[in-house]
Structure formats: structure tokens, C-alpha cells
């Protein structure tokens, strides 16, 4: 599936992702696309490659808490997309 098609699927499904720290959720991710186990997000924060984060993924039909690992930062610096690998 092309990046544009995947982004369209994410938009249609209204997928959102939030960083979770303790009992707080932080709206710091703009989900660009979702594949089977990869979230591609834009964020104002720069996470380290390999860093693991607790996140809440919400779509039209479900909510789940999981962990992700920062896999890569791709694209030009002004349009940087962070790839998050879903671990569980």
C-alpha cells in the first residue's frame, strides 16, 4: 500500500496515539499512517532510536495501551516522520 493510501486509511479510521506517563496521557503525536505493527507519526519531540514509550492507540472501534520502540526518523527535517514499532 502506498504511503498516501496508508495515510488515507489512518485518516478514515481516525487513529490517534497518545504518550502515556503514569495516569497522564499527552497528545504529542499526529498519526500519519498505520501499518500492521508500525505507527508513522509527526511529533514536536525528537525521541532516540531504540527508545521505548508507553502509548495509547485509539481508533473508531477500540482503545489499547501498548509499548512502542522508536525505529527511525525519516524525511526532511521540516517534514520529519517518526516510525514507532508496536511491541505488544
Predicted stretch roles:
Residues 1-88:
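Structured alpha-helical
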